[in-house]
């Protein structure tokens, strides 16, 4: 009678990088009564060099660095007698286990593959299939090594090499994106992807693709009907395409150049175009908008020289009022990334704004924030040192329709000149819904 091996899988997951690997501190335990202890080391991460331009886009993320509760390693085995079989080892936060068993004959050498690929699952019937809603390229596909001896399989990722790259798409947290590619071969695939991807950015605003972009390959990122990024992996920037085991970053955040390409003055036509751009963004769910540039292009309107983007938010409010549309009030989270000064009447009746974040502003003009009725939060990232409040209405009626506006100040604001220090929920003769120091 032929002897059949049914065995439990022993996993030793080692760091796999191009340059080094970490040694395990633990040692394997003796086999007793057919059971084995599973030993797990650090997970091999991609990593992003903090000195590279890519790491400055959005929130850098070196990727997965350790095994987590629920992680799985999949083993497939093909026996001449028992055919194709698959088993999933599951990590519970401290050890690995599987309820499955794999069988082969004593006198045969089975065909075995082991890999970490979260896009796959093992069914109750012992077959491997893509998880619902998953496509190759949406997760890693890292192959491991194995040895079979005396009916025991030992798996290790030591020395494993990624034959693919990672593309980190920097977007807005929890936002769903449509990503289309050309000449992109997903990790774990042997041919290029033909279907678009639907990716949801994580809490850091990042979404990922794993695979190889050939020289000349393209990637397009859209939110609804709005194209956020079109990129080509040109021969100049990426000769021979993306490199194995390397992470790349693509900026697909909804960013507006407040300088309109380096201008200091804007036209009525450019204002109209900006209003339509903002309208398109908002109506396609792009409600976190980043504006770059310190010296923004301005337009003389009603006797005031106002940055064209701020003016466009005012004009958009009037447009929605004329159309009797109020569903977009208080929907936009606006970030003025580089601006250092808010001019007179800059944010005037901007009812579409939910929050305004100003990392670098230190100077505020008279009536700089006036009657933004749905503004929930105003954030100053730097210490405000100058407020030109000739009218006494610099923060007039902010959050009037929603029972007040929250204020966030730099923690060092308490060390500013006396008039610029907050007291309780009062700052600059204005009662705020709350004041938070960060």
Locations of regions flagged by a protein language model:
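N-terminal segments that cap or nucleate solenoid repeat domains
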Residues: 256-313
């Amino acid at each position: 009678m032929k002897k059949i091996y049914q065995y439990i899988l022993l996993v030793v997951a080692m760091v796999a990088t191009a340059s080094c690997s970490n040694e395990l501190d633990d040692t394997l335990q003796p086999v007793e009564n057919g059971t084995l202890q599973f030993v797990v080391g650090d997970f091999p991460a991609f990593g992003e060099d903090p000195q590279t331009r890519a790491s400055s886009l959005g929130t850098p993320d070196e990727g997965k660095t350790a095994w987590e509760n629920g992680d799985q390693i999949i083993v497939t085995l093909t026996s001449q007698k028992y055919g194709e079989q698959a088993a999933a080892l599951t990590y519970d936060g401290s050890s690995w286990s599987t309820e499955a068993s794999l069988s082969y004959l004593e006198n045969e050498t089975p065909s075995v593959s082991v890999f970490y690929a979260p896009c796959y699952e093992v069914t109750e019937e012992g077959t491997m299939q893509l998880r619902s809603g998953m496509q190759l390229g949406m997760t890693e596909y890292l192959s491991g090594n194995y040895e079979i001896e005396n009916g025991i399989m030992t798996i290790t990722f030591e020395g494993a090499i990624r034959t693919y790259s990672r593309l980190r798409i920097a977007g807005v947290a929890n936002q769903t994106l449509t990503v289309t590619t050309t000449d992109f071969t997903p990790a774990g695939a042997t041919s290029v992807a033909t279907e678009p991807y639907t990716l949801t950015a994580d809490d850091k605003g990042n979404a990922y693709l794993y695979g190889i972009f050939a020289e000349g390959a393209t990637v397009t990122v859209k939110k609804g009907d709005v194209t956020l990024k079109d990129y080509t992996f040109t021969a100049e920037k990426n000769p021979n395409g993306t490199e194995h085991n390397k992470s790349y970053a693509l900026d697909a955040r909804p960013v507006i150049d407040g300088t309109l390409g380096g201008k200091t003055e804007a036209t009525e036509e450019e204002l109209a175009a900006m209003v339509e751009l903002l309208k398109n963004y908002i109506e396609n769910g792009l409600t976190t908008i980043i504006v770059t540039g310190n010296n923004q292009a301005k337009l003389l309107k009603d006797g005031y020289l106002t940055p064209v983007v701020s003016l466009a938010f005012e004009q958009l409010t009037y447009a929605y009022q004329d159309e009797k549309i109020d569903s977009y009030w208080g929907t936009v989270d606006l970030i003025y990334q580089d601006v250092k000064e808010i001019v007179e009447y800059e944010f005037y009746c901007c009812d579409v704004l939910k929050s305004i974040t100003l990392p670098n502003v230190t100077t505020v003009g008279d009536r700089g924030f006036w009657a933004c009725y749905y503004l929930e939060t105003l954030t100053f990232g730097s210490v405000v040192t100058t407020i030109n409040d000739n009218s006494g209405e610099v923060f007039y009626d902010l959050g009037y329709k929603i029972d007040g506006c929250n204020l966030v100040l730099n923690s060092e604001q308490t060390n500013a000149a006396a008039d610029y220090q907050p007291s309780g929920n009062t700052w600059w003769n204005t009662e705020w819904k709350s004041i938070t120091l960060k």
